[in-house]
Amino acid sequence: MSEQTGLALPQTMDRSCWVCFATDEDDRTAEWVRPCRCRGSTKWVHQTCLQRWVDEKQRGNSTARVACPQCNAEYLIVFPKLGPVVYVLDLADRLISKACPFAAAGIMVGSIYWTAVTYGAVTVMQVVGHKEGLDVMERADPLFLLIGLPTIPVMLILGKMIRWEDYVLRLWRKYSNKLQILNSIFPGIGCPVPRIPAEANPLADHVSATRILCGALVFPTIATIVGKLMFSSVNSNLQRTILGGIAFVAIKGAFKVYFKQQQYLRQAHRKILNYPEQEGA
């Protein structure tokens, strides 16, 4: 019996906390715990030191699981039993925490949907006319309005994403040397280029995405203004807006095609100069 006590005493006195590296001699009143499968010097740890270490790992989430950094054994963490009132409150708090992300997503989707509905209604009144637009929406089926109005901004954005100017540019570069009309209007357009420049993806830049969004949403307003300026003799608001939109798209597209072609030629004729030698070198 005395030999077993003599063997156990050195083992107890050799305990060392792997967090603060203190031993039994440093603090004889400290509470020790062996929370994992580790052996040797990392087997023991102070209860208070391990509590602080677990708090750092959980970062305020008391339900998060924490494991030993050496053997990866999960710590067995127990809490005192809760009373019925505290248990119900804790359950409600966890349910609310889990439901909040879904509720936030639903609110976001609902906000976007009703914003699209409002934009669609304003667009109808702007294109058709204020009084005529209200009459059309009052006579329409409510279900049709709830489905049709939010599709207006979606269709505008999808239509804006169609880059028809690029197809025109390809045809321009392919057949410009065969069309004498283009050569007479734009001298030198059919001349061969020394190299083919690399073209960037227009949708790769987030700025291009914002330009597509803003351009699509402001298009009905621009079409209405252009229609009033260029086709004031047309009595129908809808026809005037459609003509204004077509004219705006055609004029803007023509300038954009010409601008891109000039940039293409400028990049094709780019040269890299020799490095200037310093005098006396």
Curated annotation (Swiss-Prot):
A zinc finger (RING-CH-type) spans 9-78. It is found in: Mitochondrion outer membrane; Endoplasmic reticulum membrane. Zn(2+) 1 binds at C17, C20, H46, C49. The RING-CH-type zinc finger domain is required for E3 ligase activity. One of its GO terms (molecular function) is ubiquitin protein ligase activity. One of its GO terms (biological process) is regulation of mitochondrial fission. It holds the Pfam family RINGv. PROSITE patterns: ZF_RING_CH. Keywords: Endoplasmic reticulum, Membrane, Metal-binding, Mitochondrion, Mitochondrion outer membrane, Transferase, Transmembrane, Transmembrane helix, Ubl conjugation pathway, Zinc, Zinc-finger. The chain crosses the membrane at residues 102-122, 142-162, 212-232, 241-261. It catalyses: S-ubiquitinyl-[E2 ubiquitin-conjugating enzyme]-L-cysteine + [acceptor protein]-L-lysine = [E2 ubiquitin-conjugating enzyme]-L-cysteine + N(6)-ubiquitinyl-[acceptor protein]-L-lysine. This is E3 ubiquitin-protein ligase MARCHF5. Its EC number is 2.3.2.27. Pathway: Protein modification; protein ubiquitination. Mitochondrial E3 ubiquitin-protein ligase that plays a crucial role in the control of mitochondrial morphology by acting as a positive regulator of mitochondrial fission. May play a role in the prevention of cell senescence acting as a regulator of mitochondrial quality control. The keyword Zinc-finger applies. It is a multi-pass membrane protein. The gene is MARCHF5. Zn(2+) 2 binds at C36, C38, C68, C71. GO terms for cellular component: endoplasmic reticulum; endoplasmic reticulum membrane; mitochondrial outer membrane.
